[in-house]
A protein has these predicted regions:
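C-terminal amphipathic alpha-helical interaction region
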Residues: 2, 6, 10, 18-26, ...
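Often metal-dependent polyanion-binding catalytic scaffolds in large enzymes
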Residues: 2-462, 472, 630
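Short glycine-rich or small-residue beta-strand-to-loop segments that form or flank ligand, phosphate
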Residues: 112, 411-413, 498-499, 539-542, ...
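Beta-sheet entry/capping signal
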Residues: 283-285, 289-291, 299, 431-432, ...
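Catalytic or ion-translocation cores adjacent to nucleophile or general acid/base/metal-coordination motifs
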Residues: 302-333, 519-673
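Active-site cores of enzymes that catalyze phosphoryl transfer or operate on phosphate-rich substrates
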Residues: 372-382, 386, 419, 424-427, ...
Length: 673
């Protein structure tokens, strides 16, 4: 008997044709066939779920509305003069007006779900096209890629040595911010992620009918679960909730994406210039920052305790990741001294740990004496556990450099005993993680408005010994005291920037320095790079109105010539960070005026920095949407005034776009690249 079982929506009748679509050149129409198939199939699944969950009537209402609106769109596309013809739109409005509240909610939810699924399909297609571009070496590389950039440099006559020297000057720091209207729940985001994983699985060829059916069933189950799930939070997220939402992207994608960035750099140099770079000698090209838990400007819910919570949660996350990685290393590094050698340095430190640290659980048993790496990693695991539970515990690592030192011993021992491949595959990526994230994961910026500092100085008097009468001033002083204490409790690099919103004069910067010193905050840096003991606390003026942008160069000239400020500049290695506000300048002067004034301010700040021997690092406070100063980050970097880029740049990554940029490792890697 013939089976009535329907054919899987994604079934590949011709595997070769499917492969041709997936690898099509960027100028071939077939490249979009997989996207169309995904959108069509996801829409069909949503329709099935809609009938099952809400009935045929709701499905027909959605379909009728969809048909009318598509017909209206196509009519206008063919005949623009008919855009004013209301016939089709009136029919759609009539259908909506007849709905009761329950039906309207279900129809709205159906359209929202459709657009969510379409977005997932488009995101998967971006990943698909990125893979295809890597296969297609005959066509020009994607704009913004390492390979494309190096090719342009080579064609411009820049040598491999000069290109490598330029690379060593670069540091990019995405700074995550909270999204005040973020209502999407993590459970919903994770369901979307699982659907995306199934879409990616459907691109793996050969795709059997059974595999296609299994993926389809998984997607159908997730869509059903999505339909039965509350889409948004029923209560406003707390500051701690916002902190957790920002941290989840490290676990979802950034820990995986980071080593791939450096591998892509090395491969691109090898392919374009024929130059073999040692990945271990590359500088840290990427660091991360956050405002979540430290942004007090206009947010009364961000208390000094929130700063402590943000640092604690970030530290706990990165230490948990290191524990997982060391455990994974222990599984893999089973090299025995009966088969290969181990360095004397590693054996000596292992002996020291065995003599001085008690109560260590040896993962592979106390009698396993020949597998020295595993024994050593057991002690490293124990020391990390102690660090996570209490930074002051006797057996804890005092800082990330001690942990890195142990990893370097393992790395060196492997390389000197015919284990170079093991070191490259298993240890190098963890070393890069430690050099990037330390024990603090990211720097937490503190932000407050200039008028709050001015009001506090007025209350406290010239000697800063008056009583803080207002709650606002009391909280401000508590914040500075918390900064002083937390920079001693946590890695000092956890807090190193203080953003001054609404900055208009050099006095706004000097006010922060006075308040910080009065609270015993170490403002001056004790070293000039990330390996120093304490980088201090650099005040960062944020120029965000049109008038303040026009005055920015003059303000910084006066600040840099101030005798009180000169020693601080020296302590920071002559670096100065200045922030430019895109969103507020857009609101103040409009998009065109804002863009032009930002350009001029950047150019003037650069000229002023050259005059005073200052190394300028700009912090671009860009919104997520175009209306808030958002847009393609790569294009924004290219649009900077010629000759005005120091190699270091910080850019806000707004909460409303974090999910679309960093929820997936492939997209996170591409965004960072």
């Amino acid at each position: 008997m013939a089976s009535n079982k329907p054919k899987p929506l994604w079934k590949a009748d011709d595997q070769q044709a499917r492969l041709t679509e997936l690898t099509a050149h960027s100028d071939e129409p077939a490249k979009d066939n997989p996207l169309r198939r995904d959108v069509r199939s996801l829409g069909a699944i949503l329709g099935q779920v809609l009938v099952e969950q809400s009935g045929q009537d709701v499905f027909e209402s959605v379909e009728e509305l969809r048909r009318l609106l598509i017909e209206h769109r196509e009519t206008v596309r063919r005949s623009p003069e008919q855009a004013s013809s209301p016939k089709l739109m009136l029919q759609a409005q009539e259908i909506v007006s007849r709905m009761d509240l329950s039906r309207a909610y279900q129809v709205t939810k159906a359209f929202a779900a459709y657009f969510e699924l379409t977005n997932l399909a488009e995101t998967n297609h971006r990943k698909r096209r990125r893979r295809a571009a890597k296969l297609d070496r005959e066509h020009p590389p994607l704009p913004g890629s390492f390979r494309g950039t190096l090719l342009r440099m080579k064609e411009s006559g820049i040598s491999a040595e000069n290109a490598a020297a330029a690379l060593r000057q670069i540091t990019i720091t995405p700074v995550f911010t909270a999204h005040p209207t973020e209502v999407a729940r993590q459970t919903v985001l994770l369901k979307r992620r699982r659907i995306a994983q199934q879409l990616e699985r459907l691109d793996r060829l050969p795709l059997t009918a059974e595999d296609a059916e299994d993926c389809e069933n998984n997607i159908r189950a997730e869509v059903t679960s999505l339909w039965q799930t509350d889409e948004v939070r029923l209560a406003k997220p707390t500051v701690d909730d916002e902190i957790r939402m920002g941290l989840r992207y490290f676990r979802l994608s950034l820990f995986d994406a980071l080593p791939k960035i450096y591998a892509e750099v090395v491969e691109s140099f090898r392919e374009v210039y024929g130059l073999d770079l040692d990945e271990n000698t590359l500088p840290n090209l990427v660091h991360f920052g956050s405002w979540i838990g430290g942004d007090r400007d206009g947010n009364p819910l961000v208390k000094p305790d929130c700063i402590r919570d943000a640092l604690q949660m970030a530290r706990a996350l990165i230490l948990r990741e290191y524990l997982n990685d060391v455990e994974s290393l222990s599984d893999r590094l089973s090299s025995s001294r009966r088969q290969t050698g181990v360095s004397e340095e590693l054996l000596s430190r292992l002996q020291h740990y065995e003599n001085t640290i008690a109560g260590v659980h040896l993962a592979w048993g106390p009698h396993n004496t020949t597998e020295s790496y595993r024994r050593f990693l057991s002690y490293m695991f124990h020391k990390l556990q102690q660090s996570r539970e209490s930074a002051g515990a006797p057996a804890a690592y005092r800082d990330a450099r001690e942990f890195e030192d142990d990893l370097l011993l393992v790395n060196s021992s492997l390389r000197s005993n015919r284990g170079e491949r093991l070191a490259q595959t298993y240890v190098d990526s963890l070393l890069r993680m430690v050099r990037t994230f330390g024990f603090h994961l990211h720097t937490l910026d503190i932000r407050q408005h200039a008028r709050v500092h001015a009001h506090a100085l007025k209350e406290l008097g010239p000697e800063l010994k008056g009583d803080a009468r207002s709650a606002e001033t009391k909280e401000l002083l508590d914040t500075f005291r918390a900064i002083a204490q937390l920079k001693r409790t946590y890695p000092a690099h956890s807090i190193r920037h203080y953003i001054i919103s609404g900055a208009e004069s050099e006095n706004d910067v000097l006010a922060v320095i006075r308040l910080a010193k009065a609270a015993d905050v170490q403002v001056a840096g004790s070293a000039t790079d990330v390996h120093g003991d304490d980088p201090g606390l650099m005040p960062v003026p944020l120029f965000e109105s049109i008038d303040s942008l026009r005055a920015a160069g003059s303000v910084m000239r006066r600040l840099w010539s101030d005798p009180e400020y000169q020693p601080l500049l020296d302590s920071w290695g002559r670096w100065q960070e200045v922030m430019l506000g895109y969103s507020d300048s857009n609101k103040d002067g409009g998009m065109f005026t804002s863009t032009w004034e930002l350009y001029k301010a950047h150019r003037e700040l650069h000229h002023a920095a050259q005059e005073y021997g200052v190394k300028l690092r700009l912090f671009h406070g860009r919104g997520g949407t175009v209306g808030r100063g958002g847009g393609p980050t790569h294009a924004a970097i290219l649009a900077q005034p010629p000759g005005c880029f120091s190699g270091q740049i910080r850019i806000t990554e707004q909460g409303e776009v974090l999910n679309w940029k960093y929820a997936d490792p492939v997209l996170a890697e591409w965004n960072l690249e």
